[in-house]
């Protein structure tokens, strides 16, 4: 559940953005198209890298051990 303070912040955020004038950002430079494309491409590469690492780690954990073919009488679920 979201705390009440965060809900109030989210509700007042559009009001605050409507009060700002365009170009009122001090110290903000415009992003060139190659820089923006590079940021998007880098984000996609890092996201794919995270997906691959998670997939490999999950696959390594789900490999059966060598003792899975043994039958244990006193262990339910193994025989």
Curated annotation (Swiss-Prot):
GO BP annotation list: positive regulation of phosphatidylinositol 3-kinase/protein kinase B signal transduction; regulation of immune response
Membrane topology per record: Single-pass type I membrane protein
Residue ranges, Cytoplasmic side: 57-79
Leader sequence segment: 1-18
Region annotated GRB2 binding site, chain positions: 72-74
Post-translational modification: Phosphorylated; PIK3R1 and GRB2 associate specifically with tyrosine-phosphorylated HCST. O-glycosylated.
Family statement: Belongs to the DAP10 family.
Function: Transmembrane adapter protein which associates with KLRK1 to form an activation receptor KLRK1-HCST in lymphoid and myeloid cells; this receptor plays a major role in triggering cytotoxicity against target cells expressing cell surface ligands such as MHC class I chain-related MICA and MICB, and UL16-binding proteins (ULBPs); these ligands are up-regulated by stress conditions and pathological state such as viral infection and tumor transformation. Functions as a docking site for PI3-kinase PIK3R1 and GRB2.
Protein name: Hematopoietic cell signal transducer
GO function terms (MF aspect): phosphatidylinositol 3-kinase binding; signaling receptor binding
Location within or outside the cell: Membrane
Pfam families named among the record's database cross-references: DAP10
Assembly information from the UniProt record: Homodimer; Disulfide-linked. Heterohexamer composed of four subunits of HCST/DAP10 and two subunits of KLRK1. Interacts (via transmembrane domain) with KLRK1 (via transmembrane domain); the interaction is required for KLRK1 NK cell surface and induces NK cell-mediated cytotoxicity. Interacts with PIK3R1 and GRB2. Interacts with CLEC5A. Forms an CLEC5A/TYROBP/HCST trimolecular complex depending almost solely on TYROBP. Interacts with KLRK1. Interacts with CD300H.
Assigned keywords, A-Z: Disulfide bond, Glycoprotein, Membrane, Phosphoprotein, Signal, Transmembrane, Transmembrane helix
InterPro entries reported for this sequence: HCST (IPR009861)
The UniProt record lists the keyword rRNA-binding: no
Gene Ontology CC terms: cell surface; membrane
Annotated organism of origin: Bos taurus
Phosphotyrosine: residues bearing it: 72
Keyword S-adenosyl-L-methionine carried by entry: no
Top-rank taxon: Eukaryota
Regions of this protein lying in the Extracellular compartment: 19-35
Ranges where the record places region PIK3R1 binding site: 72-75
Transmembrane segments: 36-56
